[in-house]
Amino acid sequence: MRHYEIMVILDSSLEERTVAPSLDTYLNVIRTAGGSVEKTDVWGRRRLAYEIDKKTEGIYAVIDLQATPAAVAELDRQLRLNESVLRTKVIRPEVR
């Protein structure tokens, strides 16, 4: 298991209170593969640095998790298929 951090930018037309439950359904991919979700932090609605799909605002969420590379790849694939997800970024933070 490796430590990953995933940043997700969602469409600003969603209600902020529904973001965490909707992300939780996608995070079941990690849980069924034996991984664990350590923290889900919803930053809220923020202005984008540049337009994405003609949108200037998005709802940011950061997820810390422990999982296998295959499980994270499947999660990223499923998030990209969702039309309300504007961008995703998966990183492995350096251990200090």
UniProtKB/Swiss-Prot annotation:
It holds the Pfam family Ribosomal_S6. Disulfide bonds: none annotated. GO terms for biological process: translation. GO terms for molecular function: small ribosomal subunit rRNA binding; structural constituent of ribosome. Signal peptide: none annotated. It comes from the Bacteria. Binds together with bS18 to 16S ribosomal RNA. This is Small ribosomal subunit protein bS6. It comes from Salinispora tropica (strain ATCC BAA-916 / DSM 44818 / JCM 13857 / NBRC 105044 / CNB-440).
